[in-house]
């Protein structure tokens, strides 16, 4: 039903936040299921092309942005949307805001240009912006764990670049820069500082999720009756096809 993205610079704690958010949603709310994902997709050919273009520095920013957009559109409509229609919550480590910052601001393509390239992608219902001091982020990266998970060399090699990325997120997600259409429709919360204990971080994320979900926002990417139709279809199939609703394409199971 809801797509929730977690954004922030490398080493800020996005992976941890994604894990915690999924745990909170699964434990405290009544979604049919909670699924985690990430962009770019390291286990998909389109995602690998995008990652390799950065590692090899083989393309100009526009080419890189095109590969990230292609991966995102396929991910949006081939994987995420079907799950949202089933009433599931999807938590994505990185989504559209990463492209807006990395290619639009840092890569100097411009926000409108990158937004246009991604205009057919899903819009996160909630974006959680995670932040920490760049010095702390670099220590986490240099500790080895993040480097191993990130296939060594990608975007996060220098402290100067870390500062530029952090400033990009700050300018975009704080409202200093206008969020381009259609990605201005979702809710945005942050910065959520991840500089102390995990328990403190968890408390902050729990408060955010409760505030968001208790407000009962309408989903951006699916209609409420999409979820109802899915569950009705499942119910009718479970009754061994004894009922038929032609308007939702059901046939009796013989």
Q: What does each model-identified segment do?
A:
Residues 1-2, 32:
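Nucleotide donor/acceptor-binding cores
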Residues 4-6:
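Hydrophobic anchor at the beta1->P-loop junction of P-loop NTPases
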Residues 11-12:
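ATP-binding Walker
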Residues 15:
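Walker A/P-loop
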Residues 20-22, 135-254:
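NTP-dependent small-molecule kinase module
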Residues 23-34:
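Post-Walker A helix-loop "phosphate-sensing" segment adjacent to the P-loop in P-loop NTPases
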Residues 32-119:
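ATP-dependent small-molecule kinase phosphotransfer cores
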Residues 92-95, 120-141:
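Conserved phosphate-donor/acceptor-positioning beta-strand/loop module used by diverse small-molecule
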């Amino acid at each position: 039903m809801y797509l929730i993205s977690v954004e922030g610079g490398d080493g800020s704690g996005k992976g941890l936040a994604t894990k915690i958010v999924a745990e909170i949603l699964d434990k405290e709310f009544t979604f049919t299921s909670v699924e985690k994902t990430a962009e770019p997709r390291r286990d998909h050919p389109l995602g690998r092309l995008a990652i390799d273009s950065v590692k090899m520095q083989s393309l100009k920013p526009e080419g890189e942005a095109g590969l990230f957009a292609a991966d995102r559109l396929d991910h949006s409509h081939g994987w995420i949307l079907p799950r949202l229609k089933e009433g599931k919550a999807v938590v994505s480590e990185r989504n559209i805001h990463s492209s807006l910052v990395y290619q639009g601001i840092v890569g100097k393509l411009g926000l409108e240009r990158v937004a246009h390239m991604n205009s057919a992608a899903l819009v996160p219902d909630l974006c959680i912006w995670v932040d920490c001091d760049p010095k702390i982020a670099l220590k986490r990266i240099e500790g080895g764990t993040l480097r191993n998970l990130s296939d060594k060399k990608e975007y996060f090699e220098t402290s100067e670049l870390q500062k530029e990325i952090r400033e990009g997120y700050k300018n975009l997600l704080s409202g200093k820069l206008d969020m381009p259409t259609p990605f201005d429709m979702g809710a945005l919360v942050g910065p959520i500082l991840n500089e102390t204990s995990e328990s403190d971080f968890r408390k902050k994320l729990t408060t955010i999720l409760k505030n968001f979900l208790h407000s009962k926002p309408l989903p951006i990417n699916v209609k409420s009756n999409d979820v109802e139709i899915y569950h009705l279809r499942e119910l009718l199939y479970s009754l061994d096809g004894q009922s038929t609703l032609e308007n939702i394409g059901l046939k009796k199971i013989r």
